[in-house]
Amino acid sequence: MVHFVGAGPGAPDLITRRGAALLQAADCIIYAGSLVNPALLGLAKADCTIYNSAEMTLEQVLAVMRQNEAARKTTVRLHTGDPCLYGAIREQMDALDADGIPYDDTPGVSSFCGAAAVLSAEYTLPGVSQTVIITRMEGRTPVPED
């Protein structure tokens, strides 16, 4: 089983309870090292295998997931914020679907929500705006060449 887990906006105490429990139970954690606070790895059990995906290609990440599934081990794929928002998980889920590997998604607190909390602001105001548009600059996080 592969669990896609949102790490939240950075502070270790802002990960969800479910996300923390999955990290504590995982046999393997693959985390986005260039983006995820490494303090979250302190939740891992002593014999957990940990990979920094910033140093891996997509195929290498998928190979680890496949190996763990074959060994009946639980993998957490730890993404920054919420994995469904700019997390690039679709390509991973498509590959897992093709291989018949089960997975689920545990949402995280996205940084745009964390920013509103820090600023004591709200994004929607009655009679003013009921719309939130989330966008970012074009581009991808660099990955190693195959």
Go through each PLM region and give its residues.
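Beta-strand/loop-alpha-helix module characteristic of Rossmann-like adenine-cofactor folds
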Residues: 1-5, 103-104, 112-146
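Class I S-adenosyl-L-methionine
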Residues: 1-109, 113-114
